[in-house]
A protein has these predicted regions:
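C-terminal catalytic/motor cores of large multi-domain enzyme assemblies
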Residues: 1-282
Length: 282
């Protein structure tokens, strides 16, 4: 998917940096005591932004030879989010139907995913998705793509080795609600990754992330950092002080979107970070 992404998608990106000082203080005083993590709150904020800019939440099909294609947007927001397995490996999880979930529901959903990860065989899970994608490509007439995937998966030094016999039977006997299945790691409608949760306090800022086809957008949440900034105090006066800033990267497929199409997303984030009281209604 990574090689296909860079080969077929004309990537463009915008880096958004928000002063979240007041937002962070409100979160610590009113939301964190309820057991809700900052990652969950930021995920909710991104979801609200996506709802305000539905063009982001979609898939594109494009025929390069005929120079034509179609874009399909979705009401359901199914988030592809990379998460670290107990083994230390990375797996992209599909967080289904996050468009209307409350903070509490989002938090419990993510905790349940982490619980099920403990009994999940990464190779088996990824192979099931790969075969499903391959069959889907075959149904669309993509014979060369299908053959390439099958040959790559089953031959050579890097072939996929799945369990067999008794081991496979034992793994398949684990109830679906106790492990992650194909439905949990299949393609979502949009990708959100949080590098800030992996390396807190990092001074890095992402400049680009890959858009996974057929998705048309990907969001990267960076690490919160202290910086001098200009803000308005309670008396309405401009001041300079140490503030907390959050970088957010939005990468998109330029065939489907222009920067102007994305302004509703950024304006919604502006509103959320300026009036954190709305978190109480989430």
């Amino acid at each position: 998917m990574t090689s296909e992404s860079w080969r077929t998608i004309p990537h463009s990106a915008a880096i958004y940096e928000a002063d979240i000082t007041d937002f962070l203080e409100f979160f610590k005083a009113n939301i964190k005591p309820k057991g809700i993590t900052l990652n969950t709150v930021l995920l909710k904020a991104m979801t609200m932004g996506i709802k305000n800019c539905p063009q982001m939440n979609g898939h594109i099909e494009f025929n390069r030879r005929l120079v034509r294609g179609k874009i399909e947007t979705y009401k359901d927001i199914n988030i592809s989010m990379p998460m670290i397995m107990p083994s230390g490996d990375m797996m992209t999880i599909n967080l289904h139907n996050f468009e209307n979930r409350t903070l509490e529901n989002m938090q419990s959903y993510i905790l349940d995913v982490k619980r099920r990860m403990k009994k999940t065989d990464l190779t088996e899970a990824m192979f099931s998705v790969s075969m499903s994608d391959t069959l889907s490509a075959l149904k669309k007439g993509k014979l060369i793509t299908t053959l390439g995937r099958l040959i790559g998966a089953k031959t050579g030094r890097h072939k996929v080795v799945t369990s067999r016999g008794k081991d496979k039977k034992n793994y398949n006997s684990i109830p679906a609600d106790e492990r992650l299945t194909k439905e949990n790691i299949e393609q979502g409608t949009i990708t959100i990754t949080s590098t800030g949760s992996v390396y807190r306090g990092s001074h890095n800022t992402m400049s680009v992330i890959e858009v996974i086809p057929p998705q048309i957008s990907a969001i990267g949440i960076g690490s919160i950092s202290e910086k001098p900034g200009i803000y308005t105090d309670r008396n309405g006066e401009k001041q300079i002080g140490i503030r907390m800033f959050l970088p957010v990267l939005l990468a998109f497929d330029h065939r489907a979107l222009d920067f102007g199409d994305l302004t509703p997303f950024f304006k919604k984030l502006d509103d959320i970070f300026a009036t954190p009281e709305q978190m109480l209604k989430w």
